[in-house]
Amino acid sequence: MKSAVIRTREGGKFLSGVSLLTLSAVAVKVIGHAYRLPLLRVLGAAGRGDFNTAYEVYALLCVLSTAGLPVAMSVLLAGGDGAPAYRALSRRIYRVSLAVFCTIGVLGTAALLLPARLWAEMLGNPDAAASIRAVSPAVLAVCLAGAARGYFQGLSDMKPTAVSQVIEALGKLILGLAFAYFAARRGAPLPVTAACAVLGLTAGTVASAAWLLFRRARQDRRAGDALPVDMPPFPLPGRRHILRRLAAVALPVTLSAGVISLAKCEDHA
């Protein structure tokens, strides 16, 4: 009876989470449409091309960096009932995953920032180099956000993911337009104005990641108060074991998503 009640409660929580994600997806779409026309007026077709070039490279690296790991985290975390032993296990999975995400994010940011001009020339738009540099820190922010999202989704808590998506979209809308308008009014060259618009995207992504990490840290403090002093009755898996399980789930997802993204880049090149 107790397990049936838990399953019913978890099922209701999952459906509620799906509804939240659907609403956030609709909100993000609306915000995105509200963003496009004003941005085009500020940047024009050429500036918008710089923006799109930077976004394509950013999207490709984000897919390669985060497509599989949040899914793998969710798989490893799913099925827990919130008992202290499970909280101890979830903490270890989160910390190992966060270290992996952070490493990938730093490497991804460097892969965009250092050869930015090379990326721009490969995509046939040398003027987009400044925009690619402006978006490079967003790769690290997306990786950190992915760790937190994977954690919450593994616990069937979709609210943080939904809220963070709206924060990111609003940051892109408000800050991206504000930065672009400011640069245009100051008479900045078009590539610089486009880079300022991209910087708004980066700022929104950083704000989203910061909110998720704050939410995760706050939850950890609250859960810590309820944890017993003694260890759980089973040994926690080691870091290498967790890494192997993460890789087993994440690599196939990442490879398939990467192939699709590369095909899209080829279509736009």
What are these model-predicted stretches?
Residues 110, 114, 125-148:
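Alpha-helical transmembrane segments of multi-pass membrane proteins
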Residues 164-178, 187-219:
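Hydrophobic alpha-helical transmembrane segments
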Residues 67-82:
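Helix-loop junctions and terminal segments of transmembrane helices
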Residues 1-31, 88, 233-253:
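N-terminal membrane topogenesis motif
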